[in-house]
Amino acid sequence: MSDYVVIGKITKTHGLFGSVKVLPLTNALEVFQKLENVFIKNDAQSNTHRLQIEEIRKAGKGFLIKFSGIDDEERARKIVGLSLAVRVTDLPKPKSPNEYYYYELLNVEVLDQSGNFIGRVEDIIQTGSNEVAVVKNGSFEMLIPVIHDYIIKFEKRKRLVVKVPEWI
């Protein structure tokens, strides 16, 4: 699925006419507003299936989406738990060179300010205030806030240079 980026997760059905609630897995919410089609994917499998969006609207921290061909709660229930993805080429371009998508951080090597290898970004988790990179090196794990105070330099898909918090 390297040509695709997961942008959300279908969490539950909504109503009787096939709408579903989607939890965004990106902070670039404008991606959702421009969608006409998405690909659904079971995380355990590599195949994708394209769905056309009939209607999309913001609802709390997520979105309510109505797909063409999914017209009742029973059909909607079959896609609950699946991931929503878009083609990488369909993502809006970042507004500045200092902006990036979280998928671009995954698996990159992380170095401290002195050039010492810390580990690789295994995951990005969302907290209440900001996102945090989960950096692992064997059994060693470090959580680094993904904010300008800690990110010194990012070379897309290669390496991330970070300021290691003083308390570590």
UniProtKB/Swiss-Prot annotation:
Signal peptide, first to last residue: none
- The answer to whether UniProt assigns keyword Cell membrane to this entry is no
Single biological process term from Gene Ontology: rRNA processing
Keyword Oxidoreductase carried by entry: no
Subcellular location(s): the record lists: Cytoplasm
Checking PANTHER family in the record gives: RIBOSOME MATURATION FACTOR RIMM
- How does the annotation summarize its subunit structure? Binds ribosomal protein uS19.
The name this protein carries in UniProt is: Ribosome maturation factor RimM
